[in-house]
Amino acid sequence: MHPGGVESVAALPDQPIHGVVIANELLDNLPFRLAVFDGGWREAVIEAAADGSFSERLVVAPTEWAWLPLNAPHGARVPIQQRASEWVADVLAQLNGMLLCFDYCTALTAQLASIPWRDWLRTYRGHERGEHYLRNPGEQDITAQVCLDQLPPPSTVRSQAQFLARWGIDELVAEGKAQWAAQAATPSVASLLMRSRVSEAESLLDLAGLGGFVAVEWTSPHVT
């Protein structure tokens, strides 16, 4: 649930944005199209059957996808993330400040063509991995690894661990340890919260977990 004073809206405000826009795991959730290599690149479109089930059908890929790699393993798949690119561009067009996105990212689309597609096209249900993306529509989240080469060029790309270190997480942990040590004999709720900074930081900085997320920054002076 949102804290008080926070309002959910369907679109960006129709006015300049001065400050910082933060998007946490947004880009991977935006709708994407699916390219499949079958001797050449094709687009997988979804068809609905009379019984309500869904299946894929391959059609000729749009000519604007000519930037895809000329060759790939048979059956390779990659996401086409036009909506994510448009969202970033829309924010930057209104922004005087910084856009900061945290997400699962890959530098090049071609990298995804060489790995099993279910490693990057993921579904989640109840915070657990879900089933095939065509099953249980509306009951599971469908996400895709974000391909940075499909987005407007960012100003800075760092791991989440590097980003947090850059902005002082080590100092916050040291402060938490010091306050806990000073009050360990008679702990309070406040001191327990300070102690929890240690384990929370370990989780946020773990490169095999959350620390491996990518922090992508764009700075935009477009609006004055």
Which residue ranges define each predicted feature?
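Serine/threonine-rich low-complexity intrinsically disordered regions
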Residues: 5-8, 23, 49, 61, ...
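SAM cofactor-binding core of SAM-dependent methyltransferases
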Residues: 1-18
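Long, Lys/Arg- and hydrophobic-enriched amphipathic alpha-helices
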Residues: 64-224
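A short, conserved alpha-helix within the catalytic core of class I
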Residues: 9-12, 27-42, 80-90
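A mobile, often basic/glycine-rich helix-loop segment
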Residues: 20-72, 114-125
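Conserved acidic residues
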Residues: 18-19, 97
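Generic detector of intrinsically disordered, low-complexity, polar/charged segments
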Residues: 2, 16, 49, 165, ...
